[in-house]
Amino acid sequence: NPDANGWHFTWSSCCRNSNITNGLADAGFTLRAVMYSYTDSLGQVLPSNDQCHDSSPKFYEIPRTILEVGNGNDPSAPAFSNGFTYSHNAFDEEKDSISYTWGIPLSNVGYDYLTPNSTALPFSAPYSYTNPINNIFLNSTTGRTWYPANQQGNFVTCTKVSAFKCGQLVSEIYREIQVVIIPPTCNIGLNANECNV
């Protein structure tokens, strides 16, 4: 059985984009998931015999990574809804409850499951792992993110999805997406034949 620290599944590689705006460019990265044991209603601790009895949440939305400045801009919309909205659409097959928080992106150097954040990607001010894009918002229940998409750049984001079975944490999966916001290539309101793409 995994101990209180869980089983950590990682994959690391080099390198991140050279043009990252909010953190260390060219650093490596580590993708990860953590599985924890839980006690069922009969008092049995699972997983047993080194076999997993649970799966982590899966993402049913492909990453939207390249956007134009002003994407989703609607001057008549309420201020909070005026921007780009994205949902990870995480789903847990066992119907475990899930919640979303910002995760800490990691480099590819020396992952330590006891202190995984020791290899955290350093962010450049004013950015942080909880504010990887200016004015970004994450709904912890739905996983929807919203941001104004009003600044060009390459932004590393990391979302942690935690799954709970009967109130017990059973898994965490971290999803990194690099969002690239480029200059406008198509004027809003033009049809597809008039766009410069």
PLM features per residue range, with description:
Residues N1-C195:
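Long, compositionally biased, intrinsically disordered segments
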